[in-house]
């Protein structure tokens, strides 16, 4: 099983050659590089080394065209590593990239090969009053609900977690039809007696 990792955890070379990009396109391989700019059309510009790389707005995040994902999900990636696939090259040599396809590939594998109870590596990407959003592969999100963080009562996930924190999470439920993954930490924390010791 080829496990997809959260963004920032993939090896990231100083730069890619055109041959690296062509091979990745043929093999549908996931690459990672830093997003260096978001232009006025909300296209992400990516530092590749050998050429310019652009992720068009429609390819910058799952759900952006349907309105399920807001533009802040694109803007917030600037200065950070992002995962992508190579879709092709423009006539001027600019590499056309897709973060959305990398996210879809990660989710497809999770829905196909994982079951509730499986453990995934994750990185906390956002905190809300109802829980924490976690990158569970190539920027694809799972929700770690407030009640599933620990056996104690918390008023906010920030009481226990911080954005950027790496942690193992357990899959609580999978909903392929709605493309949702619910996560939990409770089962990984041990019993009351173990936690009190």
What are these regions (language model features)?
Residues 1-197:
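Single-stranded RNA-binding regions, centering on S1/OB-family and related RNA-binding modules
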């Amino acid at each position: 099983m080829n496990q997809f990792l959260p963004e920032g955890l993939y090896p990231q070379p100083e730069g890619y050659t055109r041959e690296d990009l062509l091979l990745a396109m043929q093999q549908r391989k996931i690459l990672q590089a830093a997003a260096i700019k978001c232009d006025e059309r909300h296209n992400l510009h990516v530092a590749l080394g050998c050429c310019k790389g652009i992720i068009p707005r429609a390819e910058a995040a799952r759900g952006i065209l349907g309105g399920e994902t807001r533009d802040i999900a694109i803007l917030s990636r600037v200065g950070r590593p992002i995962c992508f696939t190579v879709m092709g090259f423009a006539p001027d040599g600019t590499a056309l990239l897709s973060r959305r396809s990398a996210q879809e590939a990660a989710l497809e594998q999770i829905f196909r090969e994982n079951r509730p109870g499986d453990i995934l590596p994750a990185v906390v990407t956002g905190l809300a009053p109802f829980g924490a959003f976690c990158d569970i592969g190539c920027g694809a999100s799972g929700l770690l609900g407030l009640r599933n963080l620990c056996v104690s009562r918390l008023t906010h996930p920030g009481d226990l977690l911080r954005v950027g924190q790496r942690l193992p999470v357990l899959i609580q439920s999978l909903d392929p039809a709605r493309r949702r993954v619910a996560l939990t930490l409770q089962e990984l924390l041990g019993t009351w007696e173990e936690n009190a010791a």
